[in-house]
Structure formats: structure tokens, C-alpha cells
Amino acid sequence: MKKILILIALFTLILVGCMAQDDAPADQTAEEPTEDQTVGEITIVDGLGEHTFDGPQERIVAIEWNVAEELLAVGVQPVAVTDVEGFNKWVTIDQALDESVVDVGLRQEPNIEEIAKLEPDVIVGVTGYQEAMLPELEKIAPVVLLDSQSEEAIADIYASTLNNLRTVAQLVGKEQEAEAAITRVEDRMAEAQANIEAADLATLEFVFTQAYSSNDVPEFRLFTPNSMVSHVLEGMGLTNKIQDQEDEAYGFITANVEGVANYQEALFIHTVQLDDPLFENLSSNSAWNSLHFVENDLMFDAGSGVWTFGSVLSMETLINNVEEALTK
């Protein structure tokens, strides 16, 4: 009997031990996560290559206005922006830079010392003219330069702009906010198209210009089909009159009055700064006054603050202003 009891006791101990192993927490038996599975790690691709960060970044210095706008579009305030005064003058959007945002010089020549004082997590700009600054900026923090100059980016500036928005959103952990902003723009284009069609305009062909005076001489930036502006207006049901130009790096050609005459049988949609006397100076210009869109009252003001090189918030301003101008 004593032997039987001893055997039963040994069997019970073995059974309890097996059950304890079965109930062990999963993290004691699971494989260790690989480096690629590290929680929170972010890899983004910019115009120069890949960058890996340990998670969403918080202190961002935007040395290009588009970057500042992209951050605002996803609900993030940059630590600093180049030429804040210029941004506020030229970029009319429904989000504002906070008063705490530091001005760090010009886009073409950022103040390196001021940026260093801010101890940013990342400095974000664009390829092209800002690449020359890379060696100095990289001494301060990692630098991301969004693609703006590749053949692919130039061929479709609208698509490139959305890609750059998504990159910035990924950098700060705001991907859902970026997609919501893109959807909002697409919905507004469709809504505006319906309203413009109902307006029964004389034509749906357009020329869009950012015009300005240079030494009292009028100059017109005419936006080509590869531009963000053209894509948005075509999304509103309009057709770009300019079809005879190659893709330009910034999506426009520069013309004088004689150059504009090549596209005169169209809606002439313009953005001009309020303090620019351009149209006043043109009032006595016979060549200007004889243009089809002048004679037939087909000139439409898109407002003075449309940033024609902007991101989704500028697109919304463009849609709203053009829709109002064409349908009132």
C-alpha cells in the first residue's frame, strides 16, 4: 500500500509540472522579435533615398513652404519655418502657423545657427535648390528632402505633391489624417465640377496665370498640364488651353502679353497680389485690350493668396476661389 501511495504522489507531481508548462505565458516561449519587427520603427523614402527613424518624429523644421503646409494639413505645427512672413502673405489656407513657430531665414538660405539652437528631430525640405545645403544641415539633424525634381515628379506635380504629403504624414505618424485630407480635396473637385457645369459658361477651356509686375512690366506664369493647378482645375471639369508646351519643372511657362495672346480664346483665371498694379498698368495697353478674354469679359479673379505650388490646403483654396469666381 505504501508503494502505491508513493507512485500516486510521483504521478501527481509530474502531471502538475506538465500543466504548469502548458500555462506558461506566451512571451516565455515565443521567438524573440527580429530587428525588422521593432515596434514603432519608420522607414521613409525621399528624393535621395531611404531614411529610418525609431518612431514618429515631433520637432520638425520645415525649410520649404510646402512642408509647413503638409504638416498643418495633418494637424502638426512645425517648430520652425523659413520666411514666415512670406508664407503668411502668399499661402492662404484655412490653417495658420502658431505664433510660437520660429522664422529661420529664407528658403534659399536658411539660418543654420538658428536651426541648430532649436535642436530639431528632423529638417525637411525639397530636392533641387535645397540639396546644396545638405552638408551643413546634416550636422544638426537628419535631413529629409522630398522629391520635386525627378522626371516622374515633374511629369505629374499633383501626384508628386500627394506622395510628399504621405511621406511627411508617415514621418510624424499621421497617415490617416493625410488620406482624409486627400479625400476631402477629391470630393471638393467633384462638387465644384457639378456647380461649374450648371453655370453654363461660354467655354470650359481655361488659362490660369499667376501674374505680377516686374519693373512695371507685366509677366504671366501660365500653368501647363503637368502642374498641380492644371490637374485640380481639370478635376473641376475644365480643360487647359495650353497643350503645346513640354512639361516644365515648376509647371509653368513665363509669357508677356504677346505670349498670352496665343491662348486668348479661353477663360482667363488669374491670381495677382493686391498691392500689384498689374491690371491698372495694362488698362491703356491696346494689345491687351484687344484680347478675346478681355473683350468678352472672360477674366476671373481667383484671389490674391492662392499658392500655386502648394499642397492639399492650397488646393482647397484654389477650388473654392475658382468655383466662386466662375459661378457667381
Residues covered by each model-derived region:
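Short helix-initiation/N-cap motifs at beta->coil->alpha
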Residues: D46-L48, D103-I112, D247-V257
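A short, structured surface patch at a secondary-structure boundary
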Residues: W65-E114
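Extracytoplasmic substrate-binding proteins
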Residues: I140-S214, V312-K328
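Structured C-terminal subdomain patch of bacterial secreted/periplasmic proteins
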Residues: S160-N163, N262-K328
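Sec-dependent bacterial lipoprotein signal peptides
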Residues: M1-V16
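Bacterial lipoprotein signal-peptidase II cleavage site
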Residues: V16-V39
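Proline-aspartate-enriched helix->loop->beta-strand connector
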Residues: E119-V124, P142, V260, E265-A266
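Alpha-helical, coiled-coil/dimerization segments enriched in small aliphatic residues
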Residues: E85-W90, P218-G251
